[in-house]
Structure formats: C-alpha cells, structure tokens
C-alpha cells in the first residue's frame, strides 16, 4: 500500500482535497482515509458540489419528483474503473440527435448545457456513466399523441382492453424525426407529457411493440418447419435422376404435400376461439366455434326467412368434432317436425353426401333455434367459395367439371332411390373435401324440417326440380371456367365440351317431366370410367403413403413401452434391475440402441442402427446379440425374442 501521507505534512492546507488519492486509483481504496489522508477519496460532498458547479446555470424548470438511481437501473453500464466516482448526470435530460444543444430543457438548481461544454465534462467518460431511458424495458412507459401518430396512454390502454379498437398504432420509420421530451408519469416522473418518440433500443435489440406484449384472443399461426425439417424437393426441371439404390429424404417419409394438408386439417379441427356471447353447452355439444363469416342476407330465402349460423362443435357423447347449422327463431310446436325428417335423412349413406348426425330444438341462444348436426370436414369450402369468388385462385378445368357432374349424379341417385329430393341443391351447399375434386352435398334434411307442414308438396315435382338445380349449379361453374358473365340458361354460348353441353341441355329441358338418373347417365357413361379410374389411383396412392407410416406407428408404440419401463425411480432400489438382476438386460439394450459410441468414445447417431434393432425386437427374431456393460467387465448374450418377452412381462407388471 502506498501511503498518501509519505513525504507530506498532515497539517498542510486543504488545497490537496481536490486531488484524487493515488491509493484509490491503484488499489481501489485507501486505509489512511479515516486517519488523516488529505487527498480526495471520492466520497466528499464538497467535491460533488465543485464538479457540478463547473457548469454555469442560466435557466431552470420544475424539479424532478424522482431521481434516477444508476445502481438499480437495468440500463446502467459501468465504465472500466468502477471505483472512480463519476459526476452525477442523473439530472440531465437524454440527448436527442437532431435537436439544438441550446434547446435542451434544463433542470432546476442543476447544470445547464450551453453551446460550449466545460473541459471537465469533456474529459470525463460521460458515455459510460450517463444513464439512458429504455422504454422497451420499462413497464411504466406511456406515450402520448404526437405529430407522428403515436396514441396517448389513455388511448393505448383503451385499445389493449378492447374499448377502442379503432385506434391505429403506426410507428414512424425514423424515430429521430420528432423532438422528444421526457415521458409523462413514467420512470422520471415529469409532469408534462412526452412530445415524441422514445430513444431507440440499444444496438442488437429488437424493438417491441407495446401492444404485442399482451396476449391476443386468436391462436398463433403455425409454421410448417415445426413439423418437418427437411428441405422440399427441387422443381421437376432441376431434379437429378437417381439410381435404383439411391434415395431422397422424401422417400423415407410421407409426401410433403400430403403431410402439409393433413397437418393443416388437424390444426383447423383443433382450433378454438373465445366463445364471446355464445353458450357453453348446446344440447350434447360444447366448444362452439363460428365458421360462417360471410354474413350473406340472401341465405334467408333458403331457410324460410330465418337467419342461420354455422358452428364447429365438440360432442359430449363420442368426443368427435361436428359442424352444426343453427336456424334462428324457429317456432316448432310439433316434435314430429324434427324427428320424422331426421329419421328419414339420417340413414342415408353416400360418399357424396354428408351424414346427418343430430337434429334438435334448443333455447340456449335465448330463442327457439333449430340445430342440425353433420359430419365435419376440416378446411372444406363450398364450390362458391372455392371457384365463385372474384379473388379465387383455384384451378378449374373440364376434367373437374366431369368429376363434379359424376359425383353429384351419384348423390342424386342415392336420394331419389330413397324416395327423397334434394331441395337445397346449390353450389353454396356443396363442399370440396379433398383432392382430386372430391365433393359432398351438405345441409340435407333442413328443407323438409322447415316445410314439414307445407301442403301440396309433390315428390315427383321436387325430384324433377333437382335436375334444373343441378343444371344451374353446373352453369355457374362453366361461367367461371370460361370467364364469361352471360345468362345462365344460354349454354350454347360457352366454349366447352359439346358432350357437356348436351348433358346440361338434358337437365334444362322443361318439356321432359320424366327425367331419371338412368337415362341421364347414358349421356356420359364413358366419362364415369375416367373419374372412377382417377379416384382409384388416388386411393392407391394414399394407401402407399399409409403403408410407410405403419412402420412409424409400430415403432412408436415400442419406444413408448421402452421409455415407460426404463429409468423409473423404483428401479434404482429394486434388486431385479441390478447387474445380477433379471431385468438388467433391458438397461443394456436401451444403451445399445440409443447410446452408441465409437472406438474413440464419441457419440454415434445412427438412425439405421436404431430402426434395425427396434424392428428385430418388435418381430422377436431368434438372432442373438451381445450386450456389454459400460465398464466392459461383463457381457450378456441374449436373443431379441428373449428381450421382447422380458420387456412385455415388465410392461404388463407395470400396468397391473
């Protein structure tokens, strides 16, 4: 320790009190501080007063309510010499680029920054010790309205609580355009509101929008990369021909397009939203999710002037997902009006008709609503939504028209053969459920329920009207295919297959009141063969993809069984799991499969080895393998069949 008093007189004048003690600079402290050392040790209030008095004062403003504490601030960044006490700059406002120095607000009884800074401030490390306000880390940051369009604290609070959702929150690209003051009621507690944007975040930090810090009512979007980390196949013109023994990652897994479609179907089926004013339970169903967002008033004609709503619901009976059509404010006094049409339509089974699962009247919506429940198909859209909207990008060609015609004819044949009629046949009531162009007629039985007591209904007349409705549906699709907007009944003006025109003309013929499915299908019987061939090819493709996943499901069950019995707490004190126990081979086999190491002790990640061992274990082959302990002092020779029996018996004992 260097004594500051060596070679000096302890009774010297106080002229050395402004000189920094060398012990503080070298060692960080001075043991003679309380024994008469006359030099400055950084804790003298007089020194602080002298430091701040070096800056002349010219004007003042309202003093701060709360002083900045650099020790408790998350934005405090100490310099290289933490022992050296720096001047207190906590009372100074944050410097804003682009603003004149003379226009910076001054503090009462404090320093004022003039056009020329004092040498003492220029020489001190102000950058390392000057505190900076970080609005992104402060929970009390409340911006007010400025010229840049930033909402005030009251408006922002109203937006976050849903009271004023119409207030936008734009963020200017240049945060230095507006002059910034001090935040209102924030960390520094200044009485006047902020007149601009806060300082930018530190380099490397991502700016955070205050609104995004609060949870939203809608679930987050999902990325496909969460489910498959392999790169997609290149375009067909960039593919390199492979040898018979070569494989690509896609050949080891399910097709990317099919996997993506199935994953999105699962996401759509399990997606829920806040129920809002909807009831918790309606009949035997819960978790109502609105599905129809189009709000078309023209649909009232289809339901005898009643409004309708569409919901996705979860069944309390079997746990499956269905969709429910609600007809608002239906006055039904006769129970047969609901039960009879349901019994008639619920037994229909066709590949192109959605199954009617339930029909009931409920007052859960504070009115008398008719609810009809059907099978649910995720991501399905009507023909109108798929091809009829102006912004639709789905491809429509002549082959799709033939496929739609064949499938709708199958649906009509099933309905007419059961003595019924599709009175609601429209392209808004036909949904596309999958590829290639698979469709289903939905909302069956609704018309018969609403018009149960209508007199003068003739089944033959209604069935003949179905052919006219089918012609109108097909002409709507033809219009979208040809890009024309002419009258629907003028089929001759469209450039399509002449045979397809002939089919539509047969459906539109009002002079023929005895149209039937048998005569109609004779017009395009050879087209039915091509549609059947396409659907059969698609079914074989799906079966091939499913056969690949069969192995994954089998091995997944086996891995679940292994992990259920391996590494349990009770096995640590059970003698059967010791090296001399009968279950010790399970531990060695688990390490042999998943914890492989090479000769140098490096971990080996060999998926082929894992699949080979698990396949042999699942099959229970008689092949023997040698399992060695980690210390290589003991080994066990055992067959896969014996291992399988041992694992099965252990798992059964665990589940009993």
UniProtKB/Swiss-Prot annotation:
Subcellular location: Cytoplasm
Any single Gene Ontology cellular-component annotation: P-body
Entry keywords, A to Z: ATP-binding, Coiled coil, Cytoplasm, Metal-binding, mRNA processing, Nucleotide-binding, Zinc, Zinc-finger
Binding positions for ATP per the UniProt entry: 325, 375-382, 428-429
Gene Ontology terms describing biological process: mRNA processing; nuclear-transcribed mRNA poly(A) tail shortening
Zinc finger (C3H1-type): 15-44
InterPro entries the UniProt entry points to: Kinase-like_dom_sf, PAN3, Pan3_PK, Prot_kinase_dom, Znf_CCCH
PANTHER family per UniProt: DEADENYLATION COMPLEX SUBUNIT PAN3, PAN2-PAN3 DEADENYLATION COMPLEX SUBUNIT PAN3
Description of its domains: The N-terminal zinc finger binds to poly(A) RNA.
Protein name: PAN2-PAN3 deadenylation complex subunit PAN3
Species of the source: Kluyveromyces lactis (strain ATCC 8585 / CBS 2359 / DSM 70799 / NBRC 1267 / NRRL Y-1140 / WM37) (Yeast)
Lineage per the UniProt record: Eukaryota, Fungi, Dikarya, Ascomycota, Saccharomycotina
């Amino acid at each position: 320790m260097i004594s500051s008093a060596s070679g000096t007189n302890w009774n010297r004048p106080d002229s050395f009190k402004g000189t920094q003690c060398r012990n503080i600079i070298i060692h960080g402290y001075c043991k003679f501080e309380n024994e008469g050392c006359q030099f400055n040790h950084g804790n003298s209030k007089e020194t602080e007063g002298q430091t701040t008095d070096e800056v002349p004062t010219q004007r003042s403003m309202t003093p701060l309510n709360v002083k900045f504490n650099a020790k408790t601030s998350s934005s405090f960044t100490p310099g290289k010499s933490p022992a050296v006490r720096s001047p207190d700059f906590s009372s100074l406002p944050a410097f804003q680029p682009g603003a004149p120095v003379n226009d910076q607000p001054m503090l009462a009884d404090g320093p004022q920054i003039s056009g020329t800074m004092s040498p003492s401030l220029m020489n001190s490390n102000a950058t390392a010790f000057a505190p900076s306000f970080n609005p992104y880390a402060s929970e009390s940051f409340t911006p007010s309205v400025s010229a840049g369009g930033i909402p005030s604290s009251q408006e922002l609070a109203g937006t976050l609580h849903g009271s004023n959702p119409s207030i936008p929150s734009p963020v200017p690209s240049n945060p230095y355009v507006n002059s910034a003051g001090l935040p209102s009621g924030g960390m520094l507690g200044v009485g006047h509101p902020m007149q601009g944007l806060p300082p930018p975040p530190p380099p490397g930090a991502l700016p955070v929008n205050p609104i995004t810090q609060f949870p939203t009512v809608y679930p987050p979007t999902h990325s496909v990369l969460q489910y498959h980390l392999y790169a997609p196949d290149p375009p067909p013109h960039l593919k390199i021909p492979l040898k018979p023994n070569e494989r690509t990652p896609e050949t080891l897994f399910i097709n990317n397009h099919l996997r993506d479609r199935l994953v999105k179907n699962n996401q759509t089926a399990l997606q829920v939203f806040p129920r809002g004013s909807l009831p918790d339970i309606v009949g035997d169903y819960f978790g109502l999710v609105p599905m129809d967002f189009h709000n078309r008033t023209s649909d009232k004609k289809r339901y005898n002037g009643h409004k309708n709503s569409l919901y996705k619901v979860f069944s309390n009976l079997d746990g499956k997902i269905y969709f429910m059509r609600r007809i608002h404010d239906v006055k039904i006094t006769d129970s047969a009006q609901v039960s009879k049409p349901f019994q008639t339509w619920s037994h229909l089974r066709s590949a192109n008709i959605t199954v009617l699962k339930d029909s009931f009247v409920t007052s859960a919506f504070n009115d008398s609503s008719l609810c009809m429940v059907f099978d649910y198909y995720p991501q399905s859209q009507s023909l109108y939504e798929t091809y009829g909207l102006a912004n639709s990008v789905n491809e429509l060609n002549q082959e799709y028209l033939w496929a739609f015609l064949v499938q709708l004819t199958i649906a009509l044949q099933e309905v007419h053969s059961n003595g019924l009629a599709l009175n609601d046949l429209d392209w808004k009531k036909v949904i596309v459920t999958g590829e290639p162009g698979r469709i289903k007629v939905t909302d069956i039985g609704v018309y018969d329920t609403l018009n149960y007591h209508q007199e003068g209904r003739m089944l033959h007349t209604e069935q003949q009207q179905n052919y006219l409705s089918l012609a109108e549906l097909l002409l709507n699709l033809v219009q979208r295919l040809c890009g024309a907007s002419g009258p629907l009944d003028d089929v001759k003006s469209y450039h399509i297959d002449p045979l397809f025109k002939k089919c539509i003309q047969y459906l539109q013929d009002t002079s023929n009141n005895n149209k039937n499915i048998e005569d109609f299908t004779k017009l395009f019987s050879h087209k039915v063969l091509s549609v059947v061939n396409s659907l059969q090819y698609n079914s074989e493709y799906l079966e091939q993809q499913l056969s690949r996943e069969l192995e994954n499901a089998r091995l997944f069950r086996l891995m679940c069984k292994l992990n259920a019995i391996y590494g349990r707490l009770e096995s640590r004190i059970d003698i059967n799991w010791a090296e001399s126990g009968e279950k010790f081979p399970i531990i060695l086999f688990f390490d042999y499969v998943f914890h492989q190491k090479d000769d140098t002790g490096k971990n080996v990640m060999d998926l082929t080895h894992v699949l080979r061992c698990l396949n042999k274990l699942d099959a229970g082959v008689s092949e023997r393998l040698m399992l060695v302990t980690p210390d290589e002092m003991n080994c066990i020779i055992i067959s896969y069949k014996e291992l399988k029996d041992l694992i099965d018996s252990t798992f059964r004992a665990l589940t009993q």
